[in-house]
């Protein structure tokens, strides 16, 4: 896979829960847009800190080219901050709403933070990742900020 979407848990206490699924129309649009640019896309929804850390580690092992990371409730978790420092590829931090915190500014190879656009934040983050990978131009007529 070329692009991995990692979605963190809603809470990081004894009551952790995975994030709600992306709406099918949003997920379908993401997969279509990535495919249009010659990339593949996979989504990993994580219900715990351990699952997020494992997904980040595997992203390096699998040779992922870019990650869209929604840390959920883990933005202040030191293990997550350390794990993103170890990513061998760029990532875009994604948040559905503006009231979620962000990872520290100098955390790893972060390209941008996209927040406050609901599920649309993922589409905007994907465009940023595709631009960084040099494959934003394709037969799809989608341009963000250009």
Task: Give the location of each predicted region.
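Short beta->alpha junction loops
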Residues: 40-51
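Mid-chain, well-packed structural core segment of small domains
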Residues: 64-102
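Short acidic active-site motifs
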Residues: 51-55, 76-79
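Short, glycine-/small-residue-rich phosphate/pyrophosphate-handling segment
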Residues: 21-22, 100-146
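Short beta-strand segments enriched in small/hydrophobic residues
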Residues: 1-16
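Short, structured coil segments at secondary-structure junctions
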Residues: 37, 87, 106-109
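Short, well-structured alpha-helical segments in soluble
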Residues: 53-63
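Short catalytic helix/loop segments, enriched in acidic residues and glycine
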Residues: 18-36
